[in-house]
């Protein structure tokens, strides 16, 4: 059996969490649980045979970012004045002070999506597992979420995208995974706090800081854009430099990154645990270093521990699930 990668262990043990989670899961008792939310406990994890033996899987990195057909970082780039995505957005949709990414989501209907037909194709290619995008950095949950109002069953297609993928994959005997990217929305959307520095809209703020009160009479009335954009905070250092986010990706407090609040971290945890509990994925990929929001929060440790404990209980004392990530 393969052990959890040594690199992850070393990264994880580097710093203590800035925010320790103050809430525990309703049925969780860490004192008696096989896996506890700390790196030492997680070292006992062993990769299940199915993942070691699976050589080919397919990942559908598909969500509202595909609607404009201009790249998966569209919701960030459209707020960068002068960029290709900004210019495309202004020409196709209008100025981002008026038509933001929330409105792109509204246009995404997924009306030609046929998960059953697609899964037949994926199965025919020899795929042994399938990965669905559960959320991207744009922060829209593609599943029915009670902790994120901005989800695909409420807005956009008004469909349970993850649920459709899950049903189709498991029906055909494929292992089912989800990828989770939303932890970075806090800094990723910082471009939406800006305004143009030139032209007729000079100084007019983009829609990144609008609130629920601004939605009266609009299609999104009753929804709080801050649940999507998460921009009611100070900008990270050098945020006007589009490349600075890469040096701040690891939440290093010395990098000048704006540190997410404890409530933001807890909400991410609640959303992810609900995803795990309701859709029972065989694998979760986090687009993060080590685990989400580490080392500023231990919510990633709690998510992983909960996931492993849940699997161990369901599979006669064996852990049959996988957590993986960017690094």
Model regions and ranges:
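Mature catalytic domains of secreted/periplasmic carbohydrate-active enzymes
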Residues: 12-15, 25-327
């Amino acid at each position: 059996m393969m052990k959890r990668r040594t690199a992850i262990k070393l990264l994880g043990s580097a710093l203590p969490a800035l925010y320790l989670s103050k809430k525990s899961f309703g049925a969780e008792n860490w004192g008696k649980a096989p896996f506890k939310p700390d790196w030492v406990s997680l070292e006992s994890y062993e990769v299940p045979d199915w993942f070691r033996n699976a050589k080919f899987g397919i990942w559908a990195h598909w969500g509202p970012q595909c609607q404009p057909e201009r790249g998966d970082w569209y919701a960030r780039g459209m707020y960068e004045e002068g960029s290709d995505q900004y210019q495309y957005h202004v020409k196709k949709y209008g100025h981002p002070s008026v038509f933001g990414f929330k409105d792109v989501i509204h246009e995404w209907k997924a009306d030609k999506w046929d998960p059953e037909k697609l899964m037949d194709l994926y199965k025919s290619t020899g795929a042994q597992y399938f990965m669905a995008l559960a959320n991207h950095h744009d922060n829209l949950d593609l599943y029915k979420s009670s902790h994120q109002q901005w989800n695909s069953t409420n807005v956009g297609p008004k469909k349970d995208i993850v649920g459709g993928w899950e049903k189709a994959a498991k029906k055909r005997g494929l292992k089912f995974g989800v990828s989770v990217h939303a932890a970075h929305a806090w800094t990723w959307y910082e471009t939406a706090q800006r305004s143009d520095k030139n032209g007729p809209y000079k100084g007019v703020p983009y829609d990144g800081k609008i609130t629920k009160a601004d939605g009266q009479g609009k299609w999104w009335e009753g929804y709080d854009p801050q649940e999507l954009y998460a921009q009611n905070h100070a900008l990270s250092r050098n945020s006007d430099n589009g490349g600075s986010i890469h040096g701040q990706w690891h939440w290093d407090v010395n990098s000048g990154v704006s540190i997410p609040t404890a409530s933001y971290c807890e909400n991410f945890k609640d959303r992810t645990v609900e995803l795990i509990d309701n859709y029972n994925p065989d694998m979760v990929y986090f687009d993060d270093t080590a685990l989400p929001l580490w080392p500023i929060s231990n919510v990633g440790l709690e998510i992983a521990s909960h996931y492993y404990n849940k699997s161990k209980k369901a599979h006669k004392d064996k852990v049959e699930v996988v957590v993986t990530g960017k690094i």
